[in-house]
Amino acid sequence: MAKLSPLTLIFIAACLSRILQLTILSGLSKALPLFDTSPSLLLSSPPPALRWDAIHFASVAYNGYEYEQQVAFQPGWLAVMRLAGEGVRFIRAASVVELKDVILGGTIVANVAFVAATLVLYKLTKHIFNPTFAFLTSLLYLLPPTATPSAPYTEPIYSLLTFSGIYLLSIKRQMVLAGLCFAGATTIRSTGIFNSITLMCFAVFGDAHIFDLDPKDYCKIRKKLKPFLSAILVVAPFFMFQHYTETVFCTRELKRASTARPWCSNSPPVSYGFVQKLYWNVGPFEYWTVSQLPNFALAMPILFFSLAGVVKFFSHLVSSSQVLNHGTEEIPPPPILFELYSVHVLTMALLLFTSHTQITLRVCLGDPVVWWNAVKLGFDNVQIGEAPTGQVKVNKFGRYWIGWTVVWGAVAAVLWAGHYPPA
């Protein structure tokens, strides 16, 4: 019998994880009454996928943007859900697409995207680190502390586009295709604009380490147009959508009647920050209240591993840049990691200081650094290189991470099925 490749094993495991979680959620949704009946506002018998933000996604994908609070969501995923719903309608030979088609189509795409994202993460990690490190990363990725990979949520397809962009950029050197993937990620989630940092830094530094650059090189950067064009490509979808919201909510008629929304008078008239703060209580330290301490506690494992991983990485980066001074042979990390860790720091800071911090549990799906940190800190004898030096063993941090993701993943499935908080 032929031995299966690691990539094939990851594919099988990813598919089984989707089947298992979907089956569990289906069973739980039949056994548990809804704590919050919001899903019933759309369908009398809502499927287990229709919970929390999926309610908004399905509504906009089916009816379009109707209310101001809905513009907090980028249009990319909603368009994909609508298109997938049309596909379901076509398969069942119906004349009109129904809401349940949109929900089912979105659920299918999200689950397929999660499997694909896992495979791309493996290939990306294999090239940056080594096959063993990549295999461990992928296995941990299949134990997410959230039920959202089984629902029509933004995270699976955002992760696929982000991982694909990083892979195309750092491994295949396809800057245009990478930029398109990153731009696609921005149409899904506004945090996709952070990928412009990765693209711009790669355009500037290439394979050079930031500490190896001569001061004269920085002067040359200002004369280069390519890095800035790359960044514009990635952030363009966000500002294009802001322009769309302006044309809808800031018409001349509304301004003359003094009924235009307050943000219409801003310069520029950007709705995003206003809507996030008014309807979702998102803003600097808005979430820092005593009542939200349990939600901070939920995200603490990821935040802890992120802090420890960031300190370890940048310490390694600085020490490896001083090889000549110390007379050591320490291997510096691949240049692309500097950009990715920088984006990781910005993402974690955003989640900690301005967002609903517990969404870290699902946003982490689109950040490869989270999973690399988990492997680096949770396993002994794993590092950058061709192969591990010695037997790879899980340590106490690894046991804690795996135990936490398994236990909380199970709890999250129950909470999701019954539409219990936290979201």
UniProtKB/Swiss-Prot annotation:
It is a multi-pass membrane protein. GO terms for cellular component: endoplasmic reticulum membrane; mannosyltransferase complex. Its main location: endoplasmic reticulum. The keyword Transmembrane applies. Pathway: Glycolipid biosynthesis; glycosylphosphatidylinositol-anchor biosynthesis. The keyword Ion transport does not apply. InterPro entries: PIG-V/Gpi18. One of its GO terms (molecular function) is alpha-1,6-mannosyltransferase activity. GO terms for biological process: GPI anchor biosynthetic process. Pfam families: Mannosyl_trans2 (PF04188). Keywords: Endoplasmic reticulum, Glycosyltransferase, GPI-anchor biosynthesis, Membrane, Transferase, Transmembrane, Transmembrane helix. The chain crosses the membrane at residues 7-27, 102-122, 128-148, 151-171, 191-211, 228-248, 298-318, 333-353, 400-420. It is found in: Endoplasmic reticulum membrane. Its EC number is 2.4.1.-. It comes from the Eukaryota. Mannosyltransferase involved in glycosylphosphatidylinositol-anchor biosynthesis. Transfers the second mannose to the glycosylphosphatidylinositol during GPI precursor assembly. Belongs to the PIGV family. This is GPI mannosyltransferase 2. It comes from Cryptococcus neoformans var. neoformans serotype D (strain JEC21 / ATCC MYA-565) (Filobasidiella neoformans).
